[in-house]
Amino acid sequence: MRTRTERRGKMGTMMDGMKRLGMAALLMLAVSGPARADDCITQSAMKPADRDALATAARGLAAKVQAGDVAGLRGATVAEYAKDFGGIEYVVGSTAPKLKGGTLVVEQVYLLDGSQLKRGADGSAPDAQFFCTLNHSMAEADFLIPGLAPGSYGFAIVNVEGTASPWRLSFLLRKEQGQWQMAGFYPTPLSAAGHDGIWYWKEARAMAARKEQWNAWLYYQQAESLLRPANFIQSTHLEKLKAEQASATPPAVSDGVSKDAPLVVKGADGAEYRFTGLGVDDSLGKDKIDIMAHLKVDQPGDAAATHKLSASAAGALLGAYPEMRRPFHGVWIVAEAAGQNPFATEFSVSEIH
């Protein structure tokens, strides 16, 4: 059992805090509609000089991240994002130790021509769409990038191999005065509890076939998290994964799980527990991933009272859906009361009764 109080505004949960900070630091969301920008060139269709320049720039950025060279990375970032670098500095500091000793391999590069994008009447940058056909096939990789200023862009995926756990470092780049500079940074692990995204996808399919809808739904979440390089990327394969997940989704969460649509679970004592979020987490690095459950708490209590409530909530969750006991290490309960710091407690499955 592990307990901690979360710092409000720093990390909403262990699972998505790093990702959110990185994107918030480097991409500004816009409310305008998406602008069509069809000019996408995949690496197989690029001129060798263009491919080499983009790959070299991405490898250089990845090397700076690996070395924890925040100053160097800031110097290689477009001006409008370099001036407010606190978020990305935090992400680099959290990520760099996990990359030590790894080999950097440029996996994919794309050229995205956003030179025809138009700013809104208020000067805001539009959302942009790029549709990339892969190797003259029916498969596509699509980019829907929010708040993208007009310009010439590239997207690069650099894998870090040979570490205890492999990582993916994805970069959005923009050409400034003939040089590629960073305009977005998206680090994600390539494995969780020792398994990659394809493994979780296959396991989710098997769970769905066994009518283990809750397990399948959560494992599909883990698969997507490991396979998607950045939140604004969609692909033919990811669409297939999402379609499979939708067909396996339990009816109780067909509209998702949120503050407006909580999952209500009744405990053995008749008490109701309202979960406002349900996902997965691998922060402990165990042999199985954990469930991450956000619990609405009306009245905040002291640590002992919150721990007791969280234990009861975890028991109610596994009591309602006992299939979850098999493929998960444990359950994180993040107790959240309005105006208070979240309080997170992890219970191994063997502790939950």
Question: Which ranges hold each PLM region?
Answer:
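Bacterial N-terminal signal peptides that target proteins for export
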Residues: 5-23
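Bacterial N-terminal signal peptides
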Residues: 22-32
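Short, low-complexity N-terminal intrinsically disordered segments enriched in polar/charged residues
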Residues: 37-67, 184-199
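Short beta-strand edge/turn micro-motifs at domain boundaries
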Residues: 38-39, 128-129, 143, 147-195, ...
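Short solvent-exposed beta->alpha transition segments
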Residues: 41-49, 55-56, 71-140, 224-254
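Alpha-helical segment of the N-proximal tetratricopeptide repeat
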Residues: 196-215
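TPR/TPR-like (Sel1-like) alpha-helical repeat modules
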Residues: 213-229
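Intrinsically disordered, low-complexity segments enriched in Gly and acidic/Ser/Thr residues
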Residues: 236-324
